[in-house]
Amino acid sequence: MLEKCPIIALDFSDLASVTTFLEHFPKEELLFVKIGMELYYSEGPSIIRYIKSLGHRIFLDLKLHDIPNTVRSSMSVLAKLGIDMTNVHAAGGVEMMKAAREGLGKGPILLAVTQLTSTSQEQMQVDQHINLSVVDSVCHYAQKAQEAGLDGVVASAQEGMQIKKQTNEHFICLTPGIRPPQTNQLDDQKRTMTPEQARIVGADYIVVGRPITKAENPYQAYLEIKEEWNRIK
């Protein structure tokens, strides 16, 4: 498994913004970064090549969700980019997730997105017509992802402990929606935890965006979050 360091969400719209942000970090500080839809759709595969040229690891967060054959073919293309981690939507079903695994191969970590951290209990039941608790829905998706041969899931840290109980010991739980203790603004995230809390309940990786990218001193903010994350072994 890759080193369990905090993953920085590069939620920017273009390469210029990314390079400006990365200038805050010493060149010897090798990072694990998340490239999402906005940046990837803006810059294309060239952003992957640029980030890899700097020695950083990449979580390509595109959340694929389509028919199995399309997902298989798409993953085979992404595998050639040299990414370290990527994902699909668990709602696509076991066959789609199996196809994603086949297309990606055995190198990069493949995760399934369960319920977004912006989704509340009420939204899930009303909009998705899922009459379960959030934790039961997330754990159901986690079990299906494991059945499909995926490496883990993306889920709120609030469900981390239950995921660990209902899957095998090597099954990864990556948690977004991480906020330092001093952060009061939750933005659009509804199910959040601090880095230390997430580690305690079983998170293997955390994704942190605005608390680092919007900080006055991004490198210092990153170091503080990394220190808190590593406080628990």
Swiss-Prot record:
The protein's annotated catalytic reaction(s) are: orotidine 5'-phosphate + H(+) = UMP + CO2
- PANTHER family named among the record's database cross-references: OROTIDINE 5'-PHOSPHATE DECARBOXYLASE
Give the enzyme's main class according to its UniProt record, as a single word: lyase
Q: What is its EC number?
A: 4.1.1.23
Quaternary data: Homodimer.
Q: Which Gene3D superfamilies match?
A: Aldolase class I
The name of this protein is Orotidine 5'-phosphate decarboxylase
Q: Which HAMAP family match?
A: OMPdecase_type1_B
Q: Name one GO cellular component term.
A: cytosol
Q: Which family does it belong to?
A: Belongs to the OMP decarboxylase family. Type 1 subfamily.
Q: Which UniProt keywords apply?
A: Decarboxylase, Lyase, Pyrimidine biosynthesis
Q: What does this protein do?
A: Catalyzes the decarboxylation of orotidine 5'-monophosphate (OMP) to uridine 5'-monophosphate (UMP).
* Stored Pfam families: OMPdecase
The coding gene here is pyrF
Its taxonomic path starts at: Bacteria, Bacillati, Bacillota, Bacilli, Lactobacillales
